[in-house]
Regions:
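A mid-to-C-terminal "edge-of-domain" accessory segment
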Residues: 8-17, 23, 263, 269-346
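Alpha/beta enzyme core
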Residues: 19, 29-54, 70-79, 92-216, ...
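Terminal or standalone catalytic/regulatory effector modules within metabolic enzymes
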Residues: 42, 52-64, 68, 331-346
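Acidic, glycine-rich active-site loops and adjacent beta-strand->loop/helix elements
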Residues: 61, 88-93, 120-121, 160-163, ...
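A glycine-rich helix N-cap at a beta->alpha junction
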Residues: 80-87
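Glycine-rich phosphate-binding active-site loops on the catalytic face of alpha/beta enzymes
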Residues: 118-120, 236-256
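Histidine/acidic-residue-rich catalytic or RNA/ligand-binding cores of hydrolases
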Residues: 201, 253-260
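Small-aliphatic-rich amphipathic alpha-helix that forms the alpha element of a beta-alpha
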Residues: 219-246
Length: 346
């Protein structure tokens, strides 16, 4: 929106960033994770306890489990803070939105918010979809317009955006502009292969924020080890919506980890993310979600790990006993963690 543009032009950060959790869809792609519908409902309750803005529940129609999840969520989930989102793709090549199965499934899921993924790279349109660029633009715009006509809030996940923009910026911007003009509520730029570094994320997000009159978000993966840094770079450039997963679960090496992203935005950058008083839920929720997916919590995870505020060296412990911030970058209680002293030979 115009306001976020002027904010970034003056170098100021956005006041608020929407946190969009995709643990239940993208996170579940991680090798070794297999979630039942019950698991997904329990995780959704934890995410609501944390207070994220959006919970992506799955892809209705992709499998029977996700259809069942949305049916049961409608009656069993009593969400206080979060909105449930159904995920799907744009209409198929040469198809008609009115009888498109995927779009129909999205509406049947009954959520107020939907997120659709579509190709935002000329190469993927011509090579993977084997269709023309005009049809690539139309597939996205038609789908957004159709879902908006049914009263939905619509997020557009611009697949392969960063690689596509590097290769053919004009086409990628055409797709985004078409989605915005069709009424998209947020354009989410996806680093689908996860190969981008923060400098590229920042400059490309800045370009898009300047070019479109629409909220811009980012969806990042951790293949370079820069998932969290990339998310922060996106916000610095004007993104007001971040998609990621709790504990960084996700395909290959994972999605960007919302746990340090939320903590960094709130504590280091002064950007509002969770409802007032909810930051202290970060540690218990991160650990609870780990339990629900049957993974051990990472003791070295920033902010919430068991050793994140554990002090072993004698010099550290004597200094910290006198003054906490001597060796702690934030007060651990802020994120629901605590200080620990370990016996050391030092």
């Amino acid at each position: 929106s115009g306001t976020s543009m002027s904010a970034t032009e003056s170098g100021a950060l956005p006041e608020t960033v929407e946190i969009y959790d995709t643990t239940l869809r993208d996170g579940a792609q991680l090798e070794g994770i297999s979630l039942t519908v019950d698991d997904k409902l329990r995780i959704a309750e934890q995410l609501d306890r944390l207070g994220v803005h959006y919970i992506e529940g799955g892809w209705p129609g992709a499998n029977p489990k996700d259809v069942e999840f949305f049916q049961r969520a409608a009656t069993e989930l009593d969400l206080e803070h979060s909105k449930l989102v159904a995920f799907g793709s744009t209409r198929r090549v040469g198809g008609d939105v009115e009888d498109d199965v995927t779009l129909g499934n999205l509406l049947d899921a009954g959520t107020d918010v939907v997120c659709i993924v579509g190709k935002c790279s000329a190469y993927h349109v011509t090579e993977a979809l084997r269709t023309g660029k005009d049809e690539g633009v139309a597939m996205v715009a038609d789908s957004v317009r159709f879902l908006k006509s049914h009263g939905r809030t619509v997020f557009f996940d611009a697949e392969h955006f960063f690689d596509g923009y590097a290769d053919d910026p004009e086409f990628s911007l055409r797709v985004l502009t078409g989605a915005a003009e069709a009424g998209a509520d947020c354009l989410v730029l996806c680093d689908t292969n996860g190969g981008s570094l923060p400098s590229r994320i920042e400059s490309m997000v800045r370009d898009v924020v300047a070019a479109v009159d629409c909220a811009v978000g980012v969806h990042l993966h951790n293949d370079t080890g820069c998932g969290v840094a990339n998310a922060l770079a996106g916000v610095v450039a004007g993104a007001t919506h971040v998609q990621g997963t709790i504990n960084g679960y996700g395909e290959r090496v994972g999605n960007c980890d919302l746990v340090p992203i939320i903590a960094n935005l709130t504590l280091k950058m002064g950007v509002e993310t969770l409802p007032e008083g909810h930051l202290a839920e970060l540690t218990p929720v991160a650990h609870h979600v780990a339990e629900l997916v049957n993974f051990a919590a990472d003791p070295q995870q920033p902010y919430v790990g068991a050793t994140a505020f554990a002090h072993k060296a004698g010099l550290h412990t004597s200094a910290i006993a006198r003054r906490r911030d001597a060796y702690e970058h934030v007060a651990p209680e802020l994120v629901g963690n605590g200080t620990r002293f370990l016996v050391s030979e030092m």
